From Swiss-Prot:
It is found in: Cell membrane. It comes from Helicobacter pylori. GO terms for biological process: copper ion homeostasis. Its main location: membrane. This is Copper-transporting ATPase. Residues 105-124, 173-194, 367-379, 706-716 are extracellular.
């Protein structure tokens, strides 16, 4: 059984990986993925052995709060920005008290100059008050940090909580010594760390605020798409307009769409017209004109006139619902490259605590001064610095932020990745297999030429009247051509469709009722022929003389034209060193012509679904990493077999289950965009990981005091600043993906 839920209380990747590790050990858990940024979790478990309530109890024991849905955050009296501002103000106040006299004695009143026991004690008490206020604004670090430590799942908050608490306790002890006059020399006289506690918390809070703002911006961009779902719609029932819940709409319902409203479900216009903003699907800002017979999709915006539409999908199966599901999966899943960071994070925090304790003991022993309290002060500074400077967040954010921003960028390009692994794998593709009809071509054959043995208008009238009864794309092409030439309609009876061959009907022909047939050559037993040398889709029109003989009256030659810009985009793909293949069920001449025209390396014609499947198997057996690009319908087996499946979606025709990547642009450029975005994302992740590993590898030893003899020691305050800058640098580097652009050549 698969379930999705949310977990509150996580602060860094050590939290999320700790939950995964703890639950992953359970025999009834098959798979679990926890995402730190959007607080989501996906789990697959054996429902015969446990249930979701039991899993929630296990997570609660670890110190976190699992919930089926995320409750809206309660509005607090002080906003996060106000809290941060107050923390900064009181930190500056404490720093002023502790260091003002060092800059200039005139900066402090004489009563606070710490020149005697009384002024020292008064100054320290004011520092303590300011410190407690700053700690109050940063209390979440202590609540979450000590809770995680209690449950043996230490995280970044645990490091901050332990380090600053140790500094506070030491300062309180020094304050006691001053108050009781038990100090021994200048080193033990009022050696406080209140300013270190405040500065550490302030820098960490600033870093977290920048981190959260960046994360929220990326998540808000995604959630804005989800907000395109209207709650109600106007249903036409018994000639009355009734406002109904979108969830109650069923296929076939007639809905009225007013100007300035969102489309509730997928459907088809049956009366009126409109201009729709489909940017949430395609990324294109220009409105799209829609008329009777055109499809409209949920979540798109009707800007001007009102129209009537018939629902073709319910809310659950609508285009917007499928996009929301894909976004949720993409945000919640993890890329393979993140596994390394997770493995390191799982042992990182305990290792840092061990290193800090070891460094404390060593410095207590080897510190150069004979005085114990001076040595204790140096050892404590090293202990706090090691805890504070280590940055598990940078490791966790390295992949999560890049993938989050990349998915946001993809949606603006009309691309949706099924999960993080799809985003990661697209860059490795070295072979792309294209379907032809509807993928490389428009999927709407148009009449190229007409060959008639009877009067042309009569031939068009016969074909128009019969093909009007068919939904086939070829039939629509002939009907459109006949309309352009004002061909009249005839009355039809006894309409019969032979799937895959053609359609026949009885109609008036030269004053008598005749059976007229329209279809491919296999549909006829002709007693005469037509000499046609053109390549294209051949559709014959004839009269049935008897059951075994047909008289040909004429023929249409149609062609399915390549989409605009396809040739250039195929060339872009080939410039990446990728081999291209065209697999189509069309005849050899048409497929060959298309492949040559577009510059595709190889092709297979007359290909049935099994033939396409076998070709992809063959390519994979040769070690190729194959991307299949199709329409998601008759290509489903091939899409499932490929390493990366791309569906060129046409609204509700999209098959999310078969697709790794869905393009609502219905444009081959999106294939190139997906590959380039994948490359840029993985490069960005590697940059983040490199920085995170290098930072911790260099700065933790520095905090331990390895360069003491070179007079280089990091104070706890500087350590806090370095840790915050490390996380912020990873976040800001990930934001560079927002500026990702596709070059046209």
């Amino acid at each position: 059984m698969k379930e999705s839920f949310y977990i509150e209380g996580m602060t860094c990747t050590a939290c999320s990986s700790g939950i995964e590790r703890s639950l992953g050990r359970k025999s009834f858990v098959k798979k679990i993925e926890v995402n730190l940024l959007n607080k989501s979790a996906n789990i697959e478990f054996n429902e015969n052995e446990t249930n979701l309530d039991e899993i929630f109890k296990l997570i609660e024991k670890l110190g976190y709060s699992p919930k089926k849905t995320l409750a809206e955050e309660k509005k607090e009296f002080f906003s996060p920005n106000v809290k941060l501002a107050l923390a900064v103000i009181f930190t500056l106040f404490v720093v002023y008290l502790s260091m003002g006299a060092m800059l200039s004695p005139s900066l402090l009143p004489k009563s606070l100059l710490a020149i005697d026991n009384h002024s020292n004690f008064l100054n320290a008490c004011l520092q303590l008050i300011g410190t407690l206020i700053v700690m109050h604004w940063g209390r979440d670090f202590y609540i979450q940090g000590f809770k995680a430590l209690w449950h043996r799942q230490p995280n970044m908050s645990s490091l901050i909580a332990i380090g600053t608490s140790a500094a506070l306790i030491s300062s309180l002890w020094q304050l006691y010594l001053v108050y009781t006059d038990h100090y021994t020399d200048q080193w033990s006289y009022g050696h406080y760390y209140f300013e270190s506690v405040c500065v550490i918390l302030m820098f960490v809070m600033v870093g977290k605020r920048i981190e959260n703002v960046s994360k929220d911006k990326a998540l808000d961009a995604m959630q804005a798409l989800m907000k395109n779902a209207p709650k109600t719609a106007l249903k036409i029932q018994n000639d009355q307009q009734i406002e109904v819940l979108v969830d109650s709409i069923v296929v076939g319902d007639i809905l009225k769409v007013l100007p300035g409203t969102l489309i509730a479900v997928d459907g088809e216009i049956i009366e009126g017209e409109g201009e729709l903003d489909e940017s949430m699907l395609s990324g294109e800002a220009l409105p799209v004109y829609k008329k009777v017979g055109d499809k409209v999709f949920s979540g798109t915006f009707n800007s001007h006139t009102s129209f009537l539409m018939k629902a073709t999908q319910n809310n659950k199966n609508s285009t917007l619902s499928q996009i929301v599901e894909m976004i949720h999966n993409a945000q919640s899943s993890k890329a393979e490259i993140s596994r390394l960071a997770d493995k390191v994070s799982s042992v990182f925090v305990p290792s840092v605590i061990a290193i800090a304790i070891l460094a404390f003991v060593v410095w207590l022993i080897i510190a150069p001064k004979p005085d114990f309290w001076w040595n204790f002060g140096i050892a404590l500074e090293v202990f706090v610095s090691v805890l504070v400077i280590s940055c598990p967040c940078a490791l966790g954010l390295a992949t999560l932020m890049s993938i989050l921003v990349a998915n946001q960028k993809a949606s603006s390009l009309g691309l949706f990745f099924k999960d993080a692994k799809s985003l990661e794998k697209a860059r490795l593709v070295n072979t792309i297999v294209f379907d032809k009809t509807g993928t490389l071509t428009n999927g709407k054959p148009v009449v190229k030429s007409v060959h008639s043995k009877i009067e042309l208008l009569e031939l068009l009238s016969l074909a128009n009247s019969i093909e009007k009864s068919s939904e086939h794309v070829i039939a629509k092409g002939i009907v459109e051509y006949a309309k352009e030439h004002n061909a009249p309609l005839k009355e039809m009876s006894e309409v019969k469709v032979k799937t895959g061959f053609g359609i026949s009907a009885k109609t008036d022909y030269q004053g008598t009722k005749e059976i007229i047939k329209v279809g491919n050559s296999e549909f006829f037993n002709p007693i005469n022929t037509l000499e046609i040398q053109e390549n294209g889709i051949l559709v014959l029109v004839g009269r049935a003389i008897n059951e075994k003989e047909d008289e040909l009256l004429g023929a249409f030659v149609l062609e399915d034209l390549p989409k605009k810009g396809v040739k250039e985009h195929v060339a872009q793909i080939k410039n990446l060193g990728i081999n291209t293949f065209l697999l189509s069920g069309d005849n050899r001449e048409n497929v060959k012509k298309c492949a040559l025209e577009l510059g595709i390396d190889g092709y297979i014609s007359n290909a049935k679904p099994q033939d396409k499947l076998n070709k992809i198997k063959e390519l994979k057996e040769k070690g190729r990493i194959v991307m299949m690009v199709g329409d998601g319908l008759n290509d489903a087996p091939s899409l499932a077999m490929s390493d990366v499946a791309v569906v060129m979606a046409k609204g509700s025709d999209v098959s999310v289950q078969a697709a790794d990547i869905v393009s609502f642009n219905n444009d081959i450029k999106s294939v190139y965009s997906a590959i380039k975005l994948s490359q840029a994302t993985i490069k960005n992740i590697k940059e983040n990981l490199f920085w995170a590993f290098c930072y911790n590898s260099v700065f933790i030893p520095l905090a331990c005091g390895v360069l003491y003899k070179a007079n280089i020691m990091l104070s706890p305050a500087i350590a806090g600043l370095a840790m915050s800058l490390s996380s912020v640098s990873v976040v800001l580097n990930s934001q560079r993906l927002r500026n990702f652009k596709i070059k046209d050549h």
